[in-house]
From Swiss-Prot:
A GO biological-process term: translation
NCBIfam families associated with the record: S18
Top-level taxon in the UniProt lineage: Bacteria
GO CC annotation, single: cytosolic small ribosomal subunit
Chain ranges passing through the membrane: none
Entry keywords, A to Z: Ribonucleoprotein, Ribosomal protein, RNA-binding, rRNA-binding
Entry similarity comment: Belongs to the bacterial ribosomal protein bS18 family.
Record-given protein name: Small ribosomal subunit protein bS18
Function, as annotated: Binds as a heterodimer with protein bS6 to the central domain of the 16S rRNA, where it helps stabilize the platform of the 30S subunit.
HAMAP family hit by this protein: Ribosomal_bS18
Amino acid sequence: MPRPTGKKFDKRRQQQNPLFKRKKFCRFTAAGVEQIDYKDTETLKDFIGENGKITPARLTGTKAHYQRQLDTAIKRARFLALLPYTDQHKA
């Protein structure tokens, strides 16, 4: 028996599941960013987890092109002491 599809089914499924995930989108593409700046620490902090790890693109929705730039920018900012390596270092 085929699974029910269509708008009605999708809305019902969203209402039933309180943990329904929204479609991810790339923040940098939406903003029209060409290069990610390592000096913009406020933006970079959004992509670092509680334990100091860089959040993967599959969780943030960032495109691969920007994820590579983001990775490099975070590493540069850490090297220049603009960002801490872990959350235990208070800056």
